[in-house]
A protein has these predicted regions:
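Structural register within alpha-helical repeat arrays
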Residues: 70-71, 107-109, 144, 181
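Alpha-helical adaptor scaffolds
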Residues: 39, 73-77, 83-133
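Register position in tetratricopeptide repeats
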Residues: 77, 113, 150, 183-187
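Structural signature of tandem alpha-helical TPR/SEL1-like repeats
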Residues: 45-58, 80-87, 115-126, 153-160
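Residue-level recognition of tetratricopeptide repeat
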Residues: 64, 98-100, 137, 171
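Long, contiguous interaction/recruitment modules in multidomain scaffold/adaptor proteins
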Residues: 1-52, 56-60
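Canonical positions in the second alpha-helix
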Residues: 56-57, 91, 129-130, 163-164
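Terminal, low-structured helical/coil segments at or just beyond the last alpha-helical repeat
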Residues: 7, 11-15, 159, 163-193
């Protein structure tokens, strides 16, 4: 009778070891990833502490592009634009096949926001690359329209924003686009008067 329990116990332990080897390690990493995200942002943490925590999370999910992208979006939502930009740069370097128009546009936006809302050549290049991959990328079109407005190129800004408005499904995005279009129309009208 005891021998049967030993065999059962050994087979159970062996099965658990095989499961962990085949599937458990990834599940364990996912749990740690989610746990780290919950503990990641303490209000009084320094930028360096946050950066180190992000690096450890990225290392934990180095073979999973979805987790890295989720992390970048999480950081963006927390207004941690410099950290989100850094995470997206890691994403584009390590997962080039998964780098689509939205990743490029989000990278451009995080760089713009972390650069005191000033455009530079890198940001403009990311916007153009995003639009080459997807000419209807709403985020890239909004940024392009904003840049065109700053350059006083109001007609092109209105074109960019009207395309963005057409493809946007998000009510908040549409309000932002409408505000930009309204400003561009006022500026264009004042130039024509």
């Amino acid at each position: 009778m005891i021998k049967k329990y030993k065999i059962f116990g050994l087979s159970l332990a062996f099965s658990a070891a095989i499961y962990f080897f085949l599937f458990g390690q990834e599940n364990f990493q996912k749990l740690n990833f989610q746990k780290d995200l919950q503990l990641n942002f303490i209000d009084n943490a320094s930028f360096e502490e946050k950066k180190n925590k992000i690096d450890s999370i990225i290392n934990l999910s180095s073979s999973n592009p979805a987790q890295v992208y989720f992390l970048a979006n999480y950081l963006f939502d927390k207004s941690e634009y410099a950290l989100a930009s850094r995470t997206l740069e890691h994403f584009t370097l390590n997962f080039p096949k998964d780098t689509d128009a939205e990743v490029m546009a989000l990278t451009a936006e995080t760089k713009y926001l972390s650069n005191n809302q000033i455009f530079n050549d890198d940001i403009e290049s990311l916007i153009e690359q995003s639009l080459l991959k997807d000419p209807a990328n709403v985020r890239a079109l909004i940024l392009k329209g904003l840049k065109q407005t700053l350059d006083e190129n109001y007609k092109d800004a209105l074109k960019s924003w009207s395309i963005a408005f057409e493809y946007s499904d998000d009510a908040d995005q549409k309000r932002i686009i409408m505000a930009g279009m309204s400003k561009a129309l006022k500026q264009l009208k004042s130039l024509e008067d």
